From Swiss-Prot:
PROSITE patterns: ALDEHYDE_DEHYDR_CYS, ALDEHYDE_DEHYDR_GLU. The keyword DNA-binding does not apply. CDD domains: ALDH_SGSD_AstD (cd07095). Its EC number is 1.2.1.71. NCBIfam families: arg_catab_astD, PRK09457.1. Pfam families: Aldedh. Pathway: Amino-acid degradation; L-arginine degradation via AST pathway; L-glutamate and succinate from L-arginine: step 4/5. The gene is astD. InterPro entries: Ald_DH/histidinol_DH, Ald_DH_C, Ald_DH_CS_CYS, Ald_DH_CS_GLU, Ald_DH_N, Aldehyde_DH_dom, SuccinylGlu_semiald_DH_AstD. This is N-succinylglutamate 5-semialdehyde dehydrogenase. It comes from the Bacteria. It catalyses: N-succinyl-L-glutamate 5-semialdehyde + NAD(+) + H2O = N-succinyl-L-glutamate + NADH + 2 H(+).
């Protein structure tokens, strides 16, 4: 029984689904998808639970959410292993994900009060108040690259605000989704407040098509995000938060310490086997000897990166991709770039047949026309050369996406120019593109999102503002508007 609906574990009535470790092939999880009827049951359960949950004091909701944080802490080792085994990422990285989940609780509580708390302004004849109210029933679609942390970034603020939730994990990480749901169960959430439905495209379509849904919070690919946007078009009453991918540029300007800049580039492009939405996909290098030296050093260090299994010792920097199919898609993308005229500096290689262990790839595309503006979700970095910094900024902005952008430079004036001209939601200076703070908003523009950033701003899309003018008593104004006469009626 792998679905959690209205406080009970039930068996899915849809297709059978299995999940294996993408490196070893070990069977990890199996269960059945939720069918459309069960998705409807989950929605009805969430709707029935909403009034009571929303009427609880914030403190009462906070207690349950903080109890979940405690359970994450006490089950950190077990959850780390589940996430690592299912995604293929190394143990060390899965541990940082669980830590981020724990830290998200306190951050979300603070964000609720700062972004969506209550305010009161005294007026001569009363007061003006601002409060925030939950939307109702929200669907959360989780991704596979951070199957615990990223859904958590929607679910926690949604519950704190008083919403009830239907959570659909990625079909590639059902085990992690179930493991997190079991901790929420132990935290003592009332029945129906949080429901879990497993499944792929059919389950997702049934969930997003529900008429009685008040909103949908999504993290994933631009293609799926656009499909959801079209499906919910013409329904302005539903909140839709889309956190999508990017074709992110990293500009290398002047480099005093080449190894430090190479380290930053590797952290930007190849961490999580290139499976972060903020990963650098395009490296913009100065033409000339300095750019040549940097690229040579980047290739030399990158070719030493050997992917390994989640529990290998010593721990590898990167593990496998989410699936063998995903690894083959990256190789195919590299081959297509070569066919267009790209010059391979480092060829991506599948280490073993039947696994997702893929080494990083680097290919120079300077002077190649018609390169697709797409996100290749894996360890593949494309390189372009530029002559002037203005040209570098134009190249950085030459994308339909707008998630992250970075600059390596000793000159603050260039960073300030980039801040003014870059079209991206995250713009970093001498920091990896993959570095983000939960105390700041996280999201992009263009094809990277719909102006509903998450992290610190997640509270914004989990509640709507209610403004009030208030007075303890009602009296006739001493000064009336022209044309109003409240004198005693004169006998005719």
């Amino acid at each position: 029984m792998t679905l959690w609906i209205n406080g009970d574990w039930v068996t899915g009535q849809g297709a059978l689904r299995v999940k294996c470790n993408p490196v070893s092939g070990e069977l990890l999880w199996q269960g059945n998808d939720a069918d459309a009827a069960q998705v409807g049951q989950a929605c009805r359960a969430a709707r029935a639970a909403f009034p009571r949950w929303a009427r609880l004091s914030f403190g009462d909701r906070q207690v349950r959410v903080e109890r979940f944080a405690g359970l994450l802490e006490s089950n950190k080792v077990e959850l780390t292993a589940i996430i690592a085994r299912e995604t293929g990422k190394p143990r060390w990285e899965a541990a940082t994900e669980v830590t981020a989940m724990i830290n998200k609780i306190a951050i979300s509580i603070k964000a609720y009060h700062v972004r969506t708390g209550e305010q009161r302004s005294e007026m001569p004849d009363g007061a003006a108040s601002l409060r925030h109210r939950p939307h109702g029933v929200l669907a959360v679609f989780g991704p596979y690259n951070f199957p615990g942390h990223l859904p958590n970034g929607h679910i926690v603020p949604a519950l704190l605000a008083g919403n009830t939730v239907i959570f659909k994990p990625s079909e590639l990480t059902p085990w992690s989704g179930e493991a997190v749901m079991r901790l929420w169960q132990q935290a003592g959430l009332p029945s129906g407040v949080l429901n879990l439905v497993q499944g792929g495209r059919e389950t997702g379509q049934a969930l997003s098509a529900l008429e009685d849904l008040d909103g949908l919070l999504f993290t994933g690919s631009a293609n799926t995000g656009y499909q959801l946007h079209r499906q919910l078009s013409g329904q302005p009453e539903k909140i839709l938060a889309l956190e999508m991918g990017g074709n992110n540029p990293l500009i290398i300007d002047d480099v005093a310490d080449i190894d430090a800049a190479v380290h930053l580039t590797i952290q930007s492009a190849f961490v999580t086997a290139g499976q972060r939405c903020t990963c650098a996909r395009r490296l913009l290098l100065k033409s000339g000897a300095q750019g040549d030296a940097f690229l040579a050093r980047l290739v030399a260090v990158s070719q030493r990166l050997t992917p390994g299994n989640w529990d290998d010792e010593p721990q590898p920097f990167i593990g496998g991709l989410i699936s063998e199919q995903a690894a083959h898609q990256v190789v195919t993308a590299w081959q297509e770039l070569e066919a267009m005229g790209g010059r391979t500096q480092l060829a991506p290689r599948l280490l073993r047949a039947g696994t997702s262990l893929l080494t990083p790839g680097i290919v120079e595309m300077t002077g190649v026309a018609g390169v697709p503006d797409e996100e290749v979700f894996g360890p593949l970095l494309r390189v372009w050369r530029y002559d002037t910094f203005d040209e570098a900024i134009r190249m950085a902005n030459n994308t339909r996406f707008g998630l992250s952008c970075g600059l390596v430079s000793s000159r603050r004036d260039k960073f300030e120019q980039l801040l003014l001209e870059a079209r991206a939601g995250i713009v970093n200076w001498n920091k990896p593109l993959t570095g983000a703070a939960s105390t700041a908003p996280f999201g992009g523009v263009g094809a990277s999102g719909n102006h509903r950033p998450s992290a610190w701003y997640a509270a914004d899309y989990c509640a709507w503002p209610m403004a009030s003018l208030e007075s303890d008593s009602l009296t006739l104004p001493t000064t009336l508007n022209p044309g109003l006469d409240f004198s005693e009626e004169v006998e005719r």
